[in-house]
Regions:
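Acidic/glycine-enriched connector segments
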Residues: 94-154
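Amphipathic, Lys/Arg-enriched alpha-helical "gate/interface" segment within cytosolic domains
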Residues: 7-15, 53, 118-127, 137-140, ...
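Glycine-rich beta-alpha loop segments
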Residues: 2-10, 17-113
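Short amphipathic alpha-helical segments
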Residues: 100-101, 162-165, 193-195
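Alpha-helical elements of the RecA-like P-loop NTPase motor core of helicases
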Residues: 97, 161, 189
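Active-site/ligand-binding-proximal alpha/beta "capping" segment
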Residues: 134-186
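Short glycine-rich anion-binding loops that position phosphate/pyrophosphate groups of nucleotides
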Residues: 59-62, 116-118, 155-159
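Active-site catalytic pocket residues across diverse enzymes, especially alpha/beta-hydrolases
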Residues: 103, 170-173, 195
């Protein structure tokens, strides 16, 4: 699968934002948010192969030898091979890398919907299309846009934030209900007890 990097980085978006008053931080912020949404939707809409996808969420910390890594990789590969769906993730390491790797091995688009963070890893090498973001909330909108299912592996605060936002959006009918699959009953069972 050929890698595509025809995107504008968050830094380029910030530099390209022109507002009447350059000192108006709110106007600058609104410009960046608008550009992130525009670019994200434009990339997804321009690629017919992205219309159906499965989005994977989970820890960036799992290494290649961890059982969850292998399960995410093989599941993503199977989804890509048998259903032809694109695979999307946050584009980082761990579960995100495993999912993108499975999609890459299946020969389907492997999207990395990335965010630049201090002290975090680079985009994983299995991403064939990167869509970079500065703001978490605009990134989450794009991560949910064309998904036919959401698959959650154990993770930290970022994974939990994504999980709770998505199930709340489904519960309140703000997004179309699609399957939410929780992988790892020891981890997710505790949350299920609370609901």
């Amino acid at each position: 699968m050929e890698k595509k990097h025809n995107y504008v980085t968050p830094e380029e978006v910030k530099q390209g934002c022109r507002v009447l008053n350059p000192d108006d931080r709110d106007a600058q912020r609104i410009c960046v948010i608008n550009e992130e949404f525009r670019q994200g939707f434009e990339i997804i809409e321009s690629q017919k192969s992205y219309k159906k996808s499965v989005t994977f969420f989970g820890s960036a910390r799992f290494k290649e030898d961890h059982p969850y890594y292998e399960k995410a990789r093989s599941l993503a590969k199977r989804i890509g091979t048998e259903l032809g769906y694109a695979i999307a993730s946050g584009g980082g390491g761990g579960i995100m890398e495993a999912a993108n790797r499975g999609g890459f091995e299946a020969g389907v688009p492997s999207l990395g919907i990335t965010i630049k963070l201090p002290h975090e890893q680079a985009t994983n090498p299995y991403v064939t299309q990167e869509i970079p973001f500065y703001f978490f909330f605009s990134r989450k909108v794009i991560m949910t846009f064309s998904a036919e299912a959401y698959i959650f592996f154990p993770g930290g605060f970022g994974t939990m934030d994504e999980f709770f936002e998505i199930v709340t959006l489904i519960q309140t009918n703000k997004i179309v209900p699609v399957p939410v699959i929780l992988f790892g009953s020891d981890f997710w069972g505790k949350i299920k007890e609370c609901t």
